Amino acid sequence: MKAGRDCSEEEHNRGNPSSPSFPREPIAGGLGTPSHSHQKERFIRVLWFACALFAVIIIFFILAFLLFDAYPIFLEIGIWDFLTGMVWNPTGIPPAYGIYALIVDSILVMILAMAISIPLGIGSAIYLAELAPYRVKTIVKPAVELLAGIPSVVFGFFGLIVLTDWIRVNFDVPTGETWLAGSILLGVMALPTIISVSEDAISSAPREVREGSFALGATHWQTISRVVTPAALSGITAAIILGIGRAVGETMAVLMVTGNAAVIPDPIWNVLSPVRTLTGTLGIEMGEVAIGSTHYHALFGVAVVLLVITLAINLLATVILARIKEKHMAAKTCSAKVAGPREQQWFAGYVQKYRNVLIGIVLGLGLLAVFRWIGLLAALLGYSAFRLIQGRISPKWTQRVAFSLILFCILSVLFALGVILLDIIVKGVPYLTWEFLTAPPSNLGRSGGIFPAIVGTMYLVIGAI
């Protein structure tokens, strides 16, 4: 009966406009009404679209500006002669505007920098994601990311004072401002990006794949190398591409330590030769060139070439990532493989096992015949020998060697960070005085302080934010 009375009351209230439970239409234009929410959503959508459109317009005008000022040099000299000319001497008589040596030097510096940073970066990322205890990780990871907060000019200053002097003394060369110095510095600068992105990619690998690998009897290193790392390959590839972008686009640090000689190293593997990059050329000459001159337009041509190289790297990265994802999805959807005759399986297994040895020998012999590059041949043969005996080493010993190399990677990164910070602190802190921080410079910068520079930097930062 009580339930019946409640139902009757509810029906009565629904039909009574004065009842609190009577459904009411929202007031038009009021806060929280559908019309107001729709207008707010529409306004936000238009605002975000305007922001995106503004960014696109800015980029378009930058590209148009570069192409407009670079066109005269392409018209006067020709694109082919500009790209393949061996001499860059804008102040000579007659002037020469060939950037082939600049392109080669930029690529060489980038390749050696990546050869340094990729193994150290991926090894350090594996340590942080898979091997480091929690307390160690909470200390080491922020320390590694601290490298990303060091300005490039500080890296360049350290390289100019410490690194070049070390190269000059240890390699007995007239100057330490070389290709090697620039690549080492760029490799260290690219490490934080590669480590952070790779570590995130490795850590995001599903836990189930690790547990499944362990359940099948795999060692920790076999799980990392054959299961976790392939699962995180797209993220690791993205990290490498970002590192390459940092190496290609860096200006100040490279400008300060490479010697800035627009020549191709002779022989090509002479890492102790001075070089000049595209970015270094822009940084050195743009501030002193006469506006509207041929030299001025040639520098804009250099900027366009640098832009094309960067764009090509990004497009290549997009293609590689797409292929990796496509291959990964195909591997997931493929449930079984068709097995052939036993002899074919044996031959395929044999080729799979020794293919690296065969490739190493063939490449080594080819390079020996063409370039007579004994060092590279020795490296290839050493790698081939390692792959040959790898199958005969127990998994536990392989794991010990691999973990030792990974530990060496993270210790090398921390050593580089420690050396840079220690040099800056030891040489800089004693000169930090109140007068130095609050006084303007005097005597043509030989005395006084840096207060105007601090204020100007803060203005730039606030304006950028």
Placement of each model-derived feature along the sequence:
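Cytoplasmic-entry segments and transmembrane alpha-helices of multi-pass inner-membrane transporters
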Residues: 120-159, 196-197, 330-358, 399-404
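Transmembrane alpha-helices
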Residues: 197-198, 214, 218-258
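Transmembrane-helix boundary motif in ABC transporter permease subunits
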Residues: 36, 113-144, 317-326, 387-395, ...
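Interhelical loop and adjacent transmembrane-helix boundary motif
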Residues: 169, 254-308
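Membrane-embedded alpha-helices of multi-pass transport/permease systems
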Residues: 60, 64, 119-126, 143, ...
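Generic hydrophobic transmembrane alpha-helix motif, especially the helices
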Residues: 145-183, 187
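Periplasmic/extracellular loop-to-transmembrane helix junction in inner-membrane transport proteins
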Residues: 30-47, 67-113, 133-134, 284-296, ...
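C-terminal transmembrane helix and the adjacent membrane-cytosol boundary/short C-terminal tail
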Residues: 199-210, 214, 287-338, 382-388
